[in-house]
From Swiss-Prot:
InterPro entries documented for this protein: LuxS_sf, Metalloenz_LuxS/M16, S-ribosylhomocysteinase
Protein name, entry field: S-ribosylhomocysteine lyase
HAMAP family: LuxS (MF_00091)
EC number: 4.4.1.21
The entry's keywords: Autoinducer synthesis, Iron, Lyase, Metal-binding, Quorum sensing
Length: 155
């Protein structure tokens, strides 16, 4: 990692972090002053563990739908290609602890879910790849370690 790269996460030393954690990965200010806050929501230890795609996919659907029940400030929830976490972005929602609360409430909702939203061929590009139980297991595991979320480097 000699030179700085354009992608923020490529500048993060993935061997130094300790999952689970939630870190502010970046902010952007729009032309009219709106601010976007992007969080790295890391469920699994990079290069050691990953989420299985059906569980990750269902958790993405559930979080994307359910988070918006807690705030209208959610812009996007996107899975990482490495399958170790998600990016969760908010607009004009600067308080880190409030973002953690939205995440915790959302994951608690996942545990109560009876079905995966938009889990059909009309609304989803890979409707056959879902696991509600897998999503619930991931949510439960992450919630159980909430006391660790702020500790990115395991210190």
């Amino acid at each position: 990692m000699a030179e700085k790269m354009n992608v923020e996460s490529f500048n993060l030393d993935h061997t130094k972090v300790k999952a689970p954690f939630v870190r502010l990965a970046g902010t952007k200010v729009g032309l009219h002053g709106d601010e976007i806050y992007k969080y790295d929501v890391r469920f699994k230890q990079p290069n050691k563990e990953h989420m299985e795609m059906p569980a990750l996919h269902s958790l993405e659907h559930l979080m994307a739908e359910l988070a918006r029940n807690h705030t209208d400030k959610v812009v996007d929830i996107s899975p990482m290609g490495c399958q170790t976490g998600f990016y969760m972005s908010f607009i004009n929602f600067s308080d880190y602890d409030d973002a953690l609360d939205v995440l915790a409430k959302t994951l608690a909702d996942v545990l109560e879910a009876k079905e995966v939203p938009a889990c059909n061929e009309v609304q989803c590009g890979w409707a056959a790849s879902h696991s509600l139980e897998g999503a619930k297991e991931l949510a439960e595991e992450f919630l159980a370690k909430r006391s660790e979320w702020k500790n990115v480097f395991g210190e």
